[in-house]
């Protein structure tokens, strides 16, 4: 019938029914679906643009690609449609032809089915008021916009209006599915509005604006039946039509009511998902709001259970309410009412109104009577999510009900109004719920596992062989199947909870199902295309649809990110609950070995390898079923996390394929590891490993060195072993090109035995992957075993040996066999194996007497190679033994005290495991001979020499049961604690890191959270977990709430003992030692400053500028804001990249802290703030607590101690006493005595030069009339006190000249021979740096002078005598001094007064008050350092005039006039300066360091790896008492004095970034332990590696002619011994660093704020003095700034409140600081911690941070 109608009217152009019609929609105030006209116009424009890109074809030529666009010439064409929803906009005239729409208005052209025929129906005629369609496509139509009102006056007026102007509108699309009915109703209502029928549409209250006429009712009925076929109507619509088939108005009214209801539901869901509460509003109001939402959703059929509601509420809690999030683990069945009780309690406590307000808490009986229910009893409503977003929505209602622009797939709920056409509601973060997700427990637990996941969709995976889903709500017929093994792309096991069916209901009303696996341990829900293909469903990515083989489209595919997704709305939900799924395969594990015990027993191998080994019987005695694997899924071994931590996975498959063709033991891989430093001489420093290519069997051999003969012995041993044991001959050995393998000796040996050496390419470690990976694996195991057992590091090779034995017995997942099985050996009997470090008692077969103990405490290492015994370490004898006479010590976990292992008791498991072996031993033990306690023949560990160090005792912490421990566990724990506790001795020789230095550790600290990648944690999956250090050293039974409330901070250590050989004209407020203050971690400091008010002031400033630096005006500051901002304008602060805040999901916050340990070595401060993990020592001592077994000294006689060296006289040095005794740093002696330079000098040429210098000096002394040559005095006649010893010293200068100097021994001069009040002044280094900086900024000329024999120009007042020079040969005579000889106490002061008088009186200079040796006049500035002068002037002639006057009195030499405009090089007071006027200045010491450092006899490594920083955080100087021989001690102290003396000289000259490390080591000069010496060597090595670094200055270009002096201050709280704080200050002049200080605070500070105040108060005096100096030298105005990262300190400075000062010291410091800031017009500014370059002065920093803070001024 339809085809006939089309053929009858073939002369009519079959264009769009709305062709070239432009109409504005009529807005009705009562319209609940108000869509703006702009959207309609945009839709029309978008459609026009899209269709204009299509090729226009004649009606008879082609068939459109869209199956819905049937050609009008085709007899089988369906009801005309204008394509899918996105193209249902109005079309132009040229685009009408290919479309299938027939025009509306002709009765025969209306396609309808017979059921639509009704007696009421009649076709609209030409006079009808309804819109007509054009009779000719070529006639352009223009319809004026109707008026805004929709009310018709009467039918006649309507007729006249429609007659005068014909209106053509776009018809609605055809309804094609019941699920699309809600969307279709919206377009149908829009169609009625455009047809001037908006007034008949029911409003919100269900009533239309006006009455409907009969014609309108007929039009409504017919159009509804035409475009809404009955087979596609929802059930509820059919029910209405079955009663009255003309009641279209009721259908519209009910549809609008559903739309309004769904809008409120969507808003409630969004509000519930975005709850936020921090206590700013009353708790009552918050509870009322939440309960109203939940009740409203429950009434609408969307039921929210208690658990989901509690999770949503707790997720929005912040501030002090945030800790309630953790209650979900303590109370699994918490209700909303209970949660609000806790919220009310915190709110009342916060408001302090518990006594004034009635208690809100309800009785339990009230809770039982609560009528509200939050259980989920019905299926949750599905709310689809539309990924397309409309940008011009104007209201929330409009967004929720916007007309769709896409054809969405069907929903599973036919009775609900789908929101697939709505714009997605944007929530606050990725954890919030979105429209389209089910508000269920599964949604809350699995929302957004990945950032690129499309919520509510399945990921189509072509590589997955199985379908996996996280939610159990879609699994039908679920059943347990624990035998299924599923691995991911990285071959890691994925635990499976259950298997079931996944049922689909596609849009063609077909149903199908596939198998699905349930697991919560995946990032996406995966839909396998392979399983879909098995049910005849394929994915077409060109059309982006799922379809059958016959082309039937089932569902659309969405491309989101890099993946393709299909909506979950096609899944049929099941009625199975999550707990059912999660518990379906819970198995009985009674009497099974716990997995952590087996994991530790088998050398911390991973679970997969252990299961393979048990399945293939490579581990005997028990089966796989004897192990409880339930904990293996989520088990995280802390020791594995630390011991096996790695950066990335090794690249596999790097070996050549031909290697697989070799027979067993014909192709070996070998490699050498080492050296391991800081071990006793008897312990090996290297090991060499061998791996067979075919069987993967491994051997390891210890080495003490890498000499040729040592390597040859090992090769001879391994070849003989393989030949005799396996009857095989080695053909090829693959090795790297190390010298130990390429030497001629080994090459001849291999050639003699017919073995081909296969060398890898140089620096190609991947080609040597087998050996390299084995070494890495063994080292991981070694670190883990030592970490777990707590044994000292010198037993490292025993851990390697133990790991090798175990790994040879573990099956390979690839070959399914172990190396022993491949080699034809029996499996390892685990009953003969003990955990590494297992405490045992060894029988003493030869005690000293019959009453002495017969048992010796020891620790099991590994099975013996040479007997049936076990290698056991005996700490009391400091050796290892090979014996079978041992008993396992019960109740002793070898190394579990800090990782919560104490809750695991393996005694019973160990007894069961070793029962058969022990019975075998017992049955065969008839009589034990005296030599049964056989000493091990392993020469590498038989006798451990530990004489320089002694084992340390560390107090063990008793682990008390926590709140979550069951009562039974409490009892067991208490019993276990009461037993004796054997602990391994603490490490004697701690490892020294290459890049860490710092003082002894006093306390633990709060670390920063970081992501740790578990690469071998013993579990079966990878998890990012934060490692948290212990909050304190107290027992672990402290309450969790108390631990949260405490504010534990990072502290960072530095110390300084500053040596200043010049007078410092600055009065220090903190005593003689300048100290520095503690520092909180960078992130914690920012949080506390920004989000909390300081304890001193209730309202600190909180505003930050765009540069993260906040200038804060003091009360007396009157400068403008731009002046304050200019303070930080040109400072050399680091450029920080923008960082987005890292947010950790709740599961990370809920993990219990894993306490880690601190390795005792290198400088790292006491709790560094930048250390990601602060680790506490886990080394144990046999004398840890009172209950442990004690071994008295008289128990062992000399026979037992024969392996130890005889006692020697030693000096015992205590760390604190040594640090407190340090007074000064002894400078390096770079000169030679007379006998060294001349008498015994074997270098003839050098000797002649020194003789020449000697005579030159003598002549100069005679010329200057240094002594009275007229009379010689007899020694007996002169008072010995007035006789000064003298000597000649010789030196070779850097320019190559040889110089001699006759000096007096002022160090032994009697006090009566000089005036102690006289001062020998020289220019202060800050004055020199200030003058140089001003010279650069003002284009000054710099002239350097030298006055020869300067001291000899000064007369001496006292009566002093010296011995004549040696060449005169008058040893018994004395001569009287007339001039100030070099070396006399008063010589410097005499010369200073002489030159000062001459400069003032003869040269017209004046000395700057407070700055000795700085002279100036209106044109010239002079800096005087003994006999060196540096002149600065704008005009070079001014310098020349001064030089001429100086030459008139003194022998003046011009070193550098400085007249060139090019770069000029100076050597001023040891500084090598490169200066180009008006451009830059560079200060360094490269040449000096290149000459001096090699003379220190420090082991330098010029070709090795360069250190990137002078020290690293996290490692500490050991406080153990030091025992050294007297001579050895003096020698090491002298060496430390030389090294620290040089480092101090460099640091205070220009390397201010090293001051913290220098000062810390300077405190340990009298404590020269091996660790301290190694740290000092590291510092010298770093100085050597960076000797070319320079302090860079550039000429400043200020906007105003002013000088800017800034000090940047920082402090580290309580990080020094005796809880002193470290303070640091850096001074900058016009953006150039001119000085720095890093010192220890003189007084103990009690808070971080107090430490910061102390640091600032220490900096202000010098700041003021420098300010005065600058104003004297340069008359420009000066701006003074003070920068700190402590907002609390700033608030104290600007506050007028004195009530909160906690004590007198703090108050006086703060008040003085206020006075200094206000009185000196200081601009106090806030600087972000990450940009605070003074951080390097107070703590050790990570490499990246250290470089970031220093690379702008030191490079």
From Swiss-Prot:
PTM description: Initially, virus-like particles (VLPs) are composed of the structural unprocessed proteins Gag and Gag-Pol, and also contain the host initiator methionine tRNA (tRNA(i)-Met) which serves as a primer for minus-strand DNA synthesis, and a dimer of genomic Ty RNA. Processing of the polyproteins occurs within the particle and proceeds by an ordered pathway, called maturation. First, the protease (PR) is released by autocatalytic cleavage of the Gag-Pol polyprotein yielding capsid protein p45 and a Pol-p154 precursor protein.
Residue spans of biased composition, Polar residues class: 48-60, 71-93, 127-152, 1005-1015, 1054-1082, 1101-1111
Domain Reverse transcriptase Ty1/copia-type stretches: 1338-1476
Catalytic activity field: DNA(n) + a 2'-deoxyribonucleoside 5'-triphosphate = DNA(n+1) + diphosphate; Endonucleolytic cleavage to 5'-phosphomonoester
Gene Ontology biological process: DNA integration; DNA recombination; proteolysis; transposition; viral translational frameshifting
Residues reported in the UniProt entry to bind Mg(2+) 3: 1610, 1652, 1685
Subcellular location: Cytoplasm; Nucleus
Alphabetically ordered keywords of this record: Aspartyl protease, ATP-binding, Cytoplasm, DNA integration, DNA recombination, DNA-binding, DNA-directed DNA polymerase, Endonuclease, Hydrolase, Magnesium, Metal-binding, Multifunctional enzyme, Nuclease, Nucleotide-binding, Nucleotidyltransferase, Nucleus, Phosphoprotein, Protease, RNA-binding, RNA-directed DNA polymerase, Transferase, Transposable element, Transposition, Viral release from host cell, Virion maturation, Zinc, Zinc-finger
GO terms assigned for molecular function: aspartic-type endopeptidase activity; ATP binding; DNA binding; DNA-directed DNA polymerase activity; RNA binding; RNA-directed DNA polymerase activity; RNA-DNA hybrid ribonuclease activity; zinc ion binding
Residues where Mg(2+) 1 binds: 671, 736
Composition-biased stretches (Basic and acidic residues): 1038-1053
Gene3D superfamilies, per database record: Ribonuclease H-like superfamily/Ribonuclease H (3.30.420.10)
Annotated Integrase catalytic domain residues: 660-835
Sequence positions bearing Phosphoserine: 416
GO cellular component terms, semicolon-separated: cytoplasm; nucleus
InterPro entries: Aspartic_peptidase_AS, DNA/RNA_pol_sf, Integrase_cat-core, Retrotran_Ty1/copia-like, RNaseH-like_sf, RNaseH_sf, RVT_2, TYA
Motif (Bipartite nuclear localization signal): 1178-1212
Record field: compositional bias (Low complexity): 1-16, 153-165, 402-418, 960-969
Domain RNase H Ty1/copia-type: 1610-1752
Site (Cleavage): 401-402, 582-583, 1217-1218
Miscellaneous comment as given in the Swiss-Prot or TrEMBL entry: Retrotransposons are mobile genetic entities that are able to replicate via an RNA intermediate and a reverse transcription step. In contrast to retroviruses, retrotransposons are non-infectious, lack an envelope and remain intracellular. Ty1 retrotransposons belong to the copia elements (pseudoviridae).
Subunit composition and interactions: The capsid protein forms a homotrimer, from which the VLPs are assembled. The protease is a homodimer, whose active site consists of two apposed aspartic acid residues.
Entry note about domains: The C-terminal RNA-binding region of CA is sufficient for all its nucleocapsid-like chaperone activities. Integrase core domain contains the D-x(n)-D-x(35)-E motif, named for the phylogenetically conserved glutamic acid and aspartic acid residues and the invariant 35 amino acid spacing between the second and third acidic residues. Each acidic residue of the D,D(35)E motif is independently essential for the 3'-processing and strand transfer activities of purified integrase protein.
Name under which the protein is recorded: Transposon Ty1-JR2 Gag-Pol polyprotein
Gene name of the encoded protein: TY1B-JR2
């Amino acid at each position: 019938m339809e085809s006939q109608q089309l053929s009858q009217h073939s002369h009519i152009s079959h264009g769009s029914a709305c062709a070239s019609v432009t109409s504005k929609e009529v807005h009705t105030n009562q319209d609940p679906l108000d869509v703006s006209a702009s959207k309609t116009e945009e839709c029309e424009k978008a459609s026009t643009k899209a269709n204009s890109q299509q090729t226009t074809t004649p009606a008879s030529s082609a068939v459109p690609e869209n199956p819905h666009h049937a050609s009008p010439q085709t007899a089988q064409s369906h009801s005309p449609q204008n394509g899918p929803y996105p193209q249902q906009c109005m079309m132009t005239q040229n685009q009408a032809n290919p479309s299938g729409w027939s025009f509306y208005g002709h009765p025969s052209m209306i396609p309808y089915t017979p059921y639509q025929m009704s007696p009421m129906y009649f076709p609209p005629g030409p006079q009808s008021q309804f819109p007509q369609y054009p009779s000719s496509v070529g006639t352009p139509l223009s319809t004026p916009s109707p008026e805004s009102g929709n009310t018709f006056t009467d039918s006649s007026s309507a007729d006249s209006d429609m007659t005068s102007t014909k209106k053509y509108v776009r018809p609605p699309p055809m309804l094609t599915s019941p699920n699309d009915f809600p969307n279709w109703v919206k377009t149908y209502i829009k169609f009625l509005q455009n047809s001037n029928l908006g007034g008949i549409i029911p409003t919100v209250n269900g009533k239309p604006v006006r009455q409907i006429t009969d014609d309108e009712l007929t039009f409504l009925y017919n159009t509804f039946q035409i475009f809404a076929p009955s087979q596609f109507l929802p059930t509820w619509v059919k029910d209405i039509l079955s009663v009255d088939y003309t009641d279209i108005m009721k259908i519209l009214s009910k549809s609008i009511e559903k739309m309004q209801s769904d809008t409120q539901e969507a808003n409630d869901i969004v509000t519930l998902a975005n709850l936020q509460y921090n206590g700013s509003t009353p708790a009552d109001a918050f509870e009322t709001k939440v309960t109203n939402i939940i009740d409203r959703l429950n009434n609408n059929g969307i039921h929210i259970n208690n658990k989901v509601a509690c999770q949503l509420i707790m997720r929005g809690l912040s501030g002090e309410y945030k800790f309630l999030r953790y209650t979900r683990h303590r109370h699994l069945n918490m209700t909303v009412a209970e949660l609000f009780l806790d919220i009310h309690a915190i709110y009342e406590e916060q408001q302090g109104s518990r006594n004034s307000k009635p208690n809100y808490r309800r009785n339990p009986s009230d809770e039982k009577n609560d009528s509200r229910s939050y259980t989920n009893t019905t299926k949750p409503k599905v709310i689809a999510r539309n990924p397309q977003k409309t940008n011009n929505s104007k209201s929330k209602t409009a967004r929720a009900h916007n007309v769709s622009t896409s054809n969405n797939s069907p929903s599973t709920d036919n009775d609900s109004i789908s929101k697939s056409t709505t714009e997605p509601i944007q929530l606050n973060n990725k954890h919030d719920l979105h429209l389209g997700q089910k508000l269920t427990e599964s949604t809350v637990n699995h929302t957004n596992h990945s950032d690129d996941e499309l919520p509510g969709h399945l990921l189509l995976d072509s590589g997955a062989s199985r379908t996996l889903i996280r939610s159990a709500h879609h699994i039908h017929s679920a059943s347990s199947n624990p035998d299924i093994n599923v691995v991911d792309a990285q071959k890691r096991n994925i635990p499976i909870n259950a298997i079931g069916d996944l049922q689909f209901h596609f849009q063609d009303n077909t149903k199908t199902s596939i198998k699905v696996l349930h697991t919560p341990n995946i990032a996406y829900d995966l839909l396998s295309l392979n399983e879909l293909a098995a049910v005849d469903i394929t994915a077409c990515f060109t059309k982006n649809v799922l379809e059958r083989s016959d082309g039937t489209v089932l569902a659309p595919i969405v491309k989101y990110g890099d993946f393709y997704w299909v909506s979950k709305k096609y899944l049929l939900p099941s009625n199975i609950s999550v707990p059912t799924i999660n518990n379906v395969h819970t198995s009985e594990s009674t009497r099974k070995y716990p997995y952590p015990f087996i994991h530790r027993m088998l050398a911390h191998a991973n679970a997969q390898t252990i299961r393979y080994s048990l399945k293939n019987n490579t581990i005997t005695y028990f089966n796989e079923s004897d192990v409880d694997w339930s904990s293996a899924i989520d088990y995280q071994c802390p020791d594995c996390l630390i011991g096996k931590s790695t950066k990335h996975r090794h690249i596999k498959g790097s070996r050549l394929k031909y290697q697989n063709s070799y027979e067993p033991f014909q192709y070996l891989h070998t490699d050498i590891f080492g050296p391991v430093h800081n071990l006793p001489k008897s312990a090996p420093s290297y090991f060499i490993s061998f791996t067979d290519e075919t069987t993967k069997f491994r051997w390891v051999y210890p080495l003490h060195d890498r000499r040729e003969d040592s390597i040859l012995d090992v090769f001879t041993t391994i070849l003989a072993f393989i030949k005799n044991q396996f009857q095989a001959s080695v053909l090829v050995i693959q090795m790297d090109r190390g010298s130990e393998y390429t030497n001629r000796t080994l090459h001849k040996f291999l050639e003699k035995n017919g073995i081909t050496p296969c060398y890898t390419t140089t620096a190609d470690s991947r080609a040597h992957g087998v050996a390299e990976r084995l070494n890495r694996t063994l080292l991981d195991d070694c670190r883990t075993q030592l970490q777990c057992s707590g044994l000292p590091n010198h037993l490292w090779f025993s851990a390697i040996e133990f790991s090798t034995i175990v790994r040879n017995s573990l099956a390979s997942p690839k070959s399914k066999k172990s190396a022993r099985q491949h080699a034809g050996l029996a499996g390892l009997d685990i009953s003969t194996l003990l955990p590494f470090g297992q405490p045992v008692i060894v029988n003493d077969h030869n005690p000293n007497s019959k009453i002495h103990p017969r048992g010796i405490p020891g620790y099991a290492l590994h099975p013996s190679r040479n007997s049936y015994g076990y290698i056991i370490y005996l700490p009391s004898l400091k050796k290892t033994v090979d014996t079978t006479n041992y008993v396992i010590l019960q109740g002793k976990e070898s190394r579990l005290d800090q990782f919560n292992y104490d809750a695991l008791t393996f005694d019973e498991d160990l007894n069961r495991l070793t029962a058969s072996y022990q019975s075998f031993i017992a049955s065969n033990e008839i009589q034990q001979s005296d030599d049964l306690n056989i000493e091990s023949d392993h020469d590498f560990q038989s006798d451990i020499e530990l004489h320089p160090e002694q084992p340390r005792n560390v107090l063990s912490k008793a682990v008390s049961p926590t709140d979550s421990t069951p009562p039974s566990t409490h009892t067991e724990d208490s019993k276990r604690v009461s037993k004796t506790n054997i602990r391994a001795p603490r490490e004697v020789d701690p490892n020294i890191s290459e890049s860490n230095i710092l003082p002894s550790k006093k306390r633990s600290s709060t670390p920063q959270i970081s992501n740790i990648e578990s690469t071998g944690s013993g579990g079966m999956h990878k998890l990012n977990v934060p490692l948290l250090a212990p909050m304190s050293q107290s027992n672990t039974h402290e309450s969790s709430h108390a631990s949260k409330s405490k504010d534990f901070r990072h502290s960072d250590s530095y110390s300084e003992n500053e040596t200043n050989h010049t007078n410092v004209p600055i009065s220090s407020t903190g005593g003689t030692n300048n100290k520095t203050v503690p520092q909180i971690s960078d992130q914690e400091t920012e949080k506390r400053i920004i989000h909390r008010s300081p304890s001193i002031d209730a309202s600190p400033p909180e505003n930050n500028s765009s540069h993260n630096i906040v200038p804060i005006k003091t009360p007396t500051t009157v400068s403008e804001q731009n002046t304050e901002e200019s303070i930080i304008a040109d400072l050399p602060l680091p450029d920080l990249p923008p960082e987005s805040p890292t947010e950790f999901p709740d599961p990370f916050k809920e993990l219990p802290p894993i306490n880690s340990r601190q390795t005792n070595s290198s400088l790292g401060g006491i709790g560094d703030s930048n250390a990601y993990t602060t680790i506490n020592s886990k080394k144990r001592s046999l004398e840890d607590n009172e209950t442990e077994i004690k071994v008295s000294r008289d128990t062992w006689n000399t026979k037992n101690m024969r392996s130890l060296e005889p006692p020697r006289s030693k000096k015992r040095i205590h760390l604190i006493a040594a640090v407190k005794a340090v007074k000064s740093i002894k400078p390096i002696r770079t000169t030679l005595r007379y006998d060294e330079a001349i008498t015994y000098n074997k270098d003839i040429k050098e000797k002649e030069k020194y003789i020449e210098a000697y005579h030159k000096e003598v002549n100069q002394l005679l010329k200057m009339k240094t002594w009275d040559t007229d009379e010689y005095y007899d020694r007996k006649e002169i008072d010995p006190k007035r006789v000064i010893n003298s000597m000649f010293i010789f030196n070779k200068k850097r320019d190559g000249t040889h110089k001699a100097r006759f000096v007096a021994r002022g160090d032994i001069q009697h006090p009566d021979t000089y005036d102690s009040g006289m001062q020998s002044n020289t220019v202060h280094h800050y004055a020199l740096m200030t003058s140089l900086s001003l010279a650069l900024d003002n284009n000054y000329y710099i002239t350097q002078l030298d006055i020869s024999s300067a001291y000899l120009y000064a007369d001496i007042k006292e009566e002093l005598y010296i011995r004549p020079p040696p060449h005169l040969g008058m040893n018994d005579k004395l001569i009287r001094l007339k001039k100030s000889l070099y070396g006399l106490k008063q010589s410097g002061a005499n010369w200073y007064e002489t030159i000062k008088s001459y400069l003032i009186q003869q040269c017209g200079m004046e000395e700057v008050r407070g700055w000795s040796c700085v002279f100036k006049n209106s044109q010239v500035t002079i800096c005087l350092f003994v006999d060196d002068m540096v002149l600065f002037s704008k005009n070079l002639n001014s310098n020349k005039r001064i030089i001429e006057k100086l030459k008139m009195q003194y022998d003046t030499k011009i070193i550098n006039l400085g007249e060139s405009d090019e770069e000029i090089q100076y050597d001023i007071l040891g500084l090598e300066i490169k200066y180009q006027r008006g451009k830059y200045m560079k200060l360094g010491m490269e040449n000096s360091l290149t000459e001096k450092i090699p003379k220190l006899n420090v082991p330098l490594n010029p070709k090795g790896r360069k250190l990137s920083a002078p020290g690293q955080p996290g490692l500490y100087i050991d406080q153990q008492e030091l025992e050294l021989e007297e001579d050895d001690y003096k020698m090491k102290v002298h060496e430390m004095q030389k090294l620290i003396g040089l480092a101090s000289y460099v640091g205070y000259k220009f390397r201010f970034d090293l001051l913290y490390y220098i000062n810390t080591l300077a405190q340990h000069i009298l404590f020269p332990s091996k660790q301290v010496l190694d740290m000092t060597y590291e510092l010298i090595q770093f100085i050597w590696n960076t000797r070319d670094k320079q302090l860079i200055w550039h000429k400043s270009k200020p906007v105003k002619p002013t000088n800017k002096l800034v000090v940047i201050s920082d402090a580290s709280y309580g990080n020094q011994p005796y809880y002193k704080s470290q303070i640091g200050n850096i001074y900058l002049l016009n953006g150039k660093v001119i000085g720095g200080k890093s010192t220890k605070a003189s007084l103990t500070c009690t808070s971080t704020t107090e430490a910061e105040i102390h640091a600032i108060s220490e900096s202000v005096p010098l700041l003021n003095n420098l300010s005065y100096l600058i104003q004297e030298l340069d008359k420009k105005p000066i701006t003074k700034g003070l920068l700190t990262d402590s907002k609390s300190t700033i608030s104290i400075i600007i506050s007028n409140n004195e009530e909160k000062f906690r004590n007198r010291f703090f108050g006086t410091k703060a008040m003085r600081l206020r006075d200094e800031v206000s009185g000196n017009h200081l601009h106090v500014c806030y600087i972000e911690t990450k940009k605070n370059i003074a951080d390097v002065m107070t703590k050790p920093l990570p490499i990246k941070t250290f470089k970031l803070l220093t690379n702008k001024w030191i490079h």
